[in-house]
Design a protein with these regions (language model features):
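Glycan-recognition surfaces
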Residues: 294, 325, 339-434, 455
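C-terminal beta-strand-rich structural cap/linker in extracellular carbohydrate-active enzymes
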Residues: 524-545
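Carbohydrate-binding surface patches
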Residues: 422-425, 430-432, 468-507, 536
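Central antiparallel beta-sheet cores of small beta-barrel/beta-sandwich binding domains
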Residues: 38-148
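Aromatic-lined carbohydrate-binding/catalytic grooves of carbohydrate-active enzymes
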Residues: 201-203, 211-319
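Structural recognition of the beta-strand scaffold that forms the well-ordered cores
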Residues: 193-199, 228-235, 270-275, 305-310, ...
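Aromatic-lined carbohydrate-recognition surfaces of secreted/lumenal glycan-active proteins
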Residues: 269-286, 331, 335-352
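Bacterial N-terminal signal peptides
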Residues: 23-33
Length: 545
């Protein structure tokens, strides 16, 4: 039971009590109030300060910090995660146990979660609060929630020095005047879905200049660049602080961003970067709030070619109905630099972005929450995309998040399905594995020429689900020159047949059929095509008139 120290003497009770009875009774109430308050203070008075816990996870070393302040029987402060800071907005006590209500940012929204803890000697045992991911997304930054389900032991101490920005007081944040809505002129880029590599899925915020240069080398030497992957995108974690003029500087892990861009360009590649329209990024680094023009000019001067712009803390400042105007601010700023920079929105499919994404100058927009490296996450995201198809067109693409191919959470068969589905969807092909250490099988998936050709087809139509029979789904994408890409997906665990009648494609003759993964022409009947599909696998064919 959670203790409350608020005691009220009922006036009617006072009137009914004899005078000689009331005084001892009132004294007893006052004593109980004092004892309860002292009891709470005894349990909480020693936990003010900084508490640190560290553990190892599949994402790397994880450090969580609590900055706590106890006053008048309440705990206030901040929970600091690798994904950013979150304020403690309420607390409860029960003996040596306590609960902290944390206000978290999750995929562009705010939500409250509970961190439960107890005092154990000179330590605190706390099960930290993490944002609940969208269904199928897996967890913070693509990490399984189960990873964080147990308590951690916190000791008093100093956190590891970080480049993250200080916590923001959102109540005193300067207000920004949003512009009247208008159409930002198309930048002429991304005539086909962008292809590249992004640091987040594999490295999260643990990135350096050296890592990016090594990835650039790998993209150039492995065949990735020659297969069409041209954008090397530095995700969250590169930012330092702003100088006296307000110009955002990279942190010490990136001593010279212009030199890094020059190096990436020398490899025949283009460099991308990451920011947020909010005061802080998802990782707690400096965002572009109120500094859109200056940041755009800075990136252009560095030689940046791609911007991923993540909603994150913007949800604490604006409503979804204001999202279009917020993104338009950066669209205008990028356009004003005169440099061609791909503009990729990351707003998790919210606010009917398909209706207005192109008008703010965006070349792509996210349609979902974050993906994680699992069949459940990938399939729940990928197979939910059919309704987005009408919004895709040359220069403007639906983005169901980055590829997890090669990160180890799925089988080679499942990664082949993942890659095929993204190709059919006309989604950006942004790899996220460690390109320095790729198996031949993973390399074969990511560089499969005929599958990439489906993704990059110049007609620019996104695929849609044609039929579903049990575990087997048939997806079709219209291609240039009257051809079709047809994918037979088996979402079940055991082999199952997939079939297609040519009349469903308005074909009245026997067309030419090619298996794109097997790289062979295959026979077909005059009526249609039937194939057995192994569990969690796919058969992808090109149907030509």
């Amino acid at each position: 039971m959670i203790r409350s120290t608020q005691y009220t003497l009922n006036a009617r009770l006072y009137e009914r009590l004899p005078r000689r009875t009331f005084l001892p009774f009132a004294c007893l109430l006052l004593a109980l109030t004092s004892v309860a308050a002292q009891s709470e203070q005894a349990h909480t008075k020693d936990i003010s300060g900084t508490w640190v816990a560290k553990t190892q996870t599949p994402m790397g070393d994880l450090e969580i910090v609590y900055e706590l302040k106890v006053q008048n029987g309440r705990i206030t402060g901040t929970q600091r995660l690798p994904f950013g800071d979150a304020p403690i907005v309420a607390s409860k006590f029960d003996g040596d146990r306590f609960e902290l209500t944390i206000e978290l940012e999750s995929f562009g929204d705010t939500q409250k979660a509970t961190a439960k803890g107890k005092i154990v000697g000179d330590t605190l045992e706390i099960a930290p609060a993490f944002p609940k991911p969208p269904e199928g997304a897996g967890g913070p930054g693509g990490a399984p929630p189960a990873m964080f389900s147990s308590s951690m032991v916190f000791h008093r101490g100093k956190p590891t020095p970080s480049n993250r920005a200080p916590a923001v007081d959102y109540n005193s944040l300067p207000k920004i005047q949003l512009p009247a809505l208008h159409s930002v002129l198309y930048n002429g880029l991304a005539a086909t879905p962008p292809m590249g590599w992004n640091s987040w899925n594999k490295f999260h915020t643990n990135i350096t200049d050296r890592t990016i240069r090594e990835i650039a080398n790998a993209m150039a030497s492995s065949g990735m660049r020659d297969a069409g992957y041209q954008y090397l995108i530095i995700d969250d974690g590169w930012q330092g602080q702003r100088d006296d003029s307000g110009r955002l500087q990279p942190n010490s892990n990136f001593p010279d961003m212009k030199a890094l861009a020059d190096y990436v360009h020398s490899k025949g590649l283009k460099l991308g970067i990451y920011s947020s329209p909010g005061p802080r990024t998802c990782g707690g680094f400096e965002g572009s709030y109120g500094q859109e023009e200056m940041d755009a000019k800075t990136w252009a001067a560095w030689g940046i070619d791609y911007l991923k712009y993540d909603w994150c803390s913007a949800s604490r400042v604006w409503k979804d109905r204001q999202m279009q105007a917020v993104y338009q601010r950066m669209g205008d700023a990028l356009r004003a630099t005169g440099r061609q920079i791909v503009f990729a929105l990351c707003q998790y499919g919210r606010a009917n972005v398909g209706d207005w994404g192109a008008s703010v100058g965006a070349n792509s927009w996210r349609t979902t929450g974050d993906i994680s490296d699992s069949w459940v996450s990938m399939s729940s995201i990928g197979f939910s995309q059919s309704s987005w198809a009408p919004f895709a067109r040359p220069g403007h693409w639906n983005d169901p998040d980055m590829l997890e191919v090669g990160n180890g959470g799925m089988s080679t068969t499942e990664y082949r399905t993942h890659f095929t589905l993204w190709a059919i969807l006309a989604a950006p092909l942004i790899a996220g594995n460690d390109l320095r250490n790729m198996s031949p099988e993973i390399m074969g998936i990511l560089t499969k020429k005929e599958v990439i050709a489906v993704n990059q087809d110049k007609l620019g139509r996104a695929g849609e689900r044609l039929s579903k029979n049990g575990d087997v789904e048939v997806w079709v994408r219209s291609l240039d020159a009257g051809a079709y890409a047809v994918a037979f997906f088996n979402r079940g665990l055991t082999p199952a047949p997939g079939s297609l009648r040519w009349t469903s494609l308005e074909i009245d003759h026997t067309p030419k059929v090619r298996d794109l993964w097997q790289h062979v022409d295959v026979p077909s009947s005059a009526d249609g095509f039937t194939v057995s599909v192994p569990g969690h696998d796919v058969v992808l064919i090109r149907v030509s008139p």
